[in-house]
A protein has these predicted regions:
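Short active-site-adjacent structural elements
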Residues: 71-73, 142, 299-301
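Phosphate-end processing signature that detects enzymes handling 5′-triphosphorylated RNA
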Residues: 148-374
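Short, structured active-site "lid" loops
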Residues: 1-19
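Structural motif
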Residues: 20, 59-61, 286-288
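Long, hydrophilic "mature protein body" segments
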Residues: 93, 113, 118, 127, ...
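ATP-dependent NMP and nucleoside kinases share a basic, alpha-helical "lid"
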Residues: 9, 14, 23-115, 119, ...
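Phosphate-binding beta-loop-alpha motif at adenosine-nucleotide cofactor sites
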Residues: 127-146
């Protein structure tokens, strides 16, 4: 499977046009169906590790929740009976599945399908860009949610064609409960560095994210909002490129250190950021919970983990923006506090340069070219 994927990845990298490689299942899925010791042996024998297989191999993970969880009426093992003339039984079954939509690959009972779905989802806990698409909507809307999620991660503006109200929400948490209160989780060490920018209302930054000595590196450009949605274009970079880009570090900001705890709860993927020292006093003991959802108000509050003491929602509160939290100067005196990342943009949503200032923010599509000249 990995060799087949590598072939397609290489073809895509060598293509002169933009390519999107979509994998039906990924390397970590196998870990859900073999004993943990066996999986660790397989990885060790092949020189692999979870960060490489789970976090850096794929840019985005989407888990489509089985119909057995939330859409049970549409989960069936039976092939409907209809006459297809003199075709043999195998052909009749294929025709039935093709014309009537039954799923020939299903063999699990409802409880078994639910259990296997949980295992498959848990295999990807910890991936930095992991979306769970549940069955809270009709199937067509479920597909639109999936497509919209991909477009959002790629920085593609879909206008209102796929508008379904999903957004990132953030909550302030009062205190960290004992680990035993959490469902299965993965902890990561995360380090953020803000970079210098000469383009108004853009925020370039680097991220180093790792576990057990294995690291992934990401370059992000945060742009002004498009149609009310914040746009962040992310690109994976190598360790060498990361070190080169650190030369652009913005001295107005502290380095941000976090432990990021990733877990699933109620078919919802959550990330709990636990801020660590060294940091500005404003960040000491800070706990922020994030998730992407279409739910709002009281219904959303009911979906939040009951084992966490939620203080309030702080989604659009600039006091809890990582950009502002990392500022070295006190907020009362600094000129760099960002109240809202908005500004003039062109018809494509790109920031308009102010007074002819040249753009020194490295856009992801030009990143490799720029790094090759350093």
């Amino acid at each position: 499977m990995i060799e087949i994927e590598n072939t397609f990845f290489t073809l895509a990298e060598n293509c002169q046009r933009n390519c999107l490689v979509i994998c039906d299942r990924g390397a970590m899925d196998a870990s859900a169906f073999v004993p943990k010791k066996d999986w660790e042996y397989i990885m060790a024998k092949n020189g692999m590790n979870p960060v490489g297989l789970r976090d850096t191999r794929y840019n985005h993970i989407i888990h489509m929740v089985t119909a057995a969880k939330g859409a049970e009426a549409f989960y069936t093992l039976e092939v409907k009976s209809r006459s297809y003339g003199s075709y043999n039984s195998g052909t009749r079954q294929l025709l039935s599945a093709y014309l009537e939509g039954d799923h020939l690959a299903r063999s699990e009972s409802l409880p078994a399908a639910q259990m296997l779905d949980d295992r498959a989802a848990e295999a990807w806990i910890g991936h930095p860009y992991f979306d769970v698409i549940d069955n809270s909507t009709e199937f067509d809307t479920k597909l639109r949610r999936m497509i919209s999620s991909v477009c959002q991660k790629m920085g593609i503006d879909t206008g209102d064609r796929l508008a379904i109200g999903a957004k990132k929400v953030k909550f302030l948490v009062r205190s960290l409960p004992d680990d035993s209160k959490f469902p299965k989780f993965q902890d990561f060490e995360v380090v953020h560095e803000y970079l210098k920018a000469s383009v108004r209302n853009t925020q370039p930054r680097l991220r180093r994210r790792g576990q057990n000595g294995h690291w992934s590196y990401t370059y992000t450009v945060r742009r002004p909002k498009i149609n009310g949605q914040q746009v962040e274009v992310k690109t994976q970079v190598t360790q060498r490129d990361y070190n080169l880009l650190l030369g652009q570090k913005d001295d107005k900001h502290f380095t941000i250190h976090k432990t990021r705890r990733c877990f699933l709860h109620n078919n919802q993927y959550f990330q709990l950021d636990i801020y660590r020292e060294p940091c500005h006093p404003r960040c000491k003991g800070l706990l922020l919970l994030e998730t992407y959802t279409t739910i709002e108000g009281k219904q959303l509050m009911k979906r939040l983990p009951e084992f966490l003491d939620i203080v309030e929602e702080v989604t659009d509160n600039p006091k809890y923006s990582m950009y502002n939290l990392s500022l070295k100067e006190e907020w009362e005196i600094t000129k760099h506090f960002c109240h809202k990342l908005e500004g003039p943009v062109d018809e494509l949503g790109n920031p308009v340069l102010i007074n002819g200032v040249s753009n020194v923010v490295l856009e992801p599509e030009h990143l490799n070219e720029a790094l090759s000249k350093i």
